Every structure is written in C-alpha cells, then in structure tokens.
C-alpha cells in the first residue's frame, strides 16, 4: 500500500467542515440537539439525497472521477450535518459502537449470513449498538 500524505481523521474532516460553516455563517452547534428547523432539516436531507443520486449516476457510467467527487461531497455534507446536530465530539465513539455491533452479525462460526441481494444479515450473536449510552454517559456520570 502506498503512503498517502493526506490521511485525514474523522475529527479533522469534521473540523474542516466546521471552519467552512463558520466562514459562511452556517449553523454549527456545540451542544447535541435533535432540534433543527424544518428548513435546515430539509436542506441537510436534500443535500445528502442529491449527492447519493450523483454517486449512482457516476457509478452507472463507470466514471471514477465523478464517483470520487460524489463520495467526497457526501462526506463533506455528512460532516456538516454532524456539526449541525452538535455531535462532533461523540460521532467517533458512535461509529466505533456501530462497528462492534456490525461485527456481531457474524455467526457462531465467524461466517457472514447474506440476503439474496448481498445485504449482510444479523446472526443470533447480534447485539444492537448502545448509542444512547455513548451520547449521555457524561451527563449520567455528572449526576
């Protein structure tokens, strides 16, 4: 594998997008919230939807440049949405918990179970990610 001089971490990516949001006077929250205005929710959703559609079109054409562009834009918009919800300090732990949960989908022999379309199915070892614990563990500890 070649050494890439530009290996960004998730938190660095989120911080770059925070800088963009602050420079363009777009919302960045420091406290977690599920409450966005209807306008902001729809904007975030529509931006993600648009990039997903651009990815599909590029993939269907086999255009790797446009695929990379769409994926980069998806990540950028996702980072902005993380900042909009004030989840920037929790999202890495959330991702790690989802990873642990997803790996629990392997069966008792360490083998994946697939649906006909290729989707990975849950085994009897599966456990649901405990996102609530991650989001509120500091608050609970302070009480």
Task: Tell what function each PLM region has.
Residues 1-143:
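Flexible "arm" and connector segments at domain edges
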């Amino acid at each position: 594998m070649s050494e890439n001089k530009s290996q960004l971490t998730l938190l660095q990516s989120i911080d770059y997008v925070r800088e963009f949001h602050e420079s363009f006077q777009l919302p960045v929250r420091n406290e977690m919230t599920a409450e966005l205005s209807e306008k902001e929710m729809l904007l975030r959703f529509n931006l993600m939807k648009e990039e997903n559609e651009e990815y599909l079109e590029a993939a269907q054409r086999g255009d790797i440049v446009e695929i990379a562009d769409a994926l980069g834009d998806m990540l950028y918009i996702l980072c902005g949405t993380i900042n909009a919800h004030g989840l920037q300090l929790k999202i890495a732990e959330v991702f790690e918990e989802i990873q642990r949960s997803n790996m629990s989908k392997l069966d008792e022999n360490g083998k994946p179970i697939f649906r006909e379309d290729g989707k990975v199915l849950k085994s009897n070892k599966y456990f649901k990610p405990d996102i609530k614990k991650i989001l509120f563990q500091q608050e609970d500890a302070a009480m």
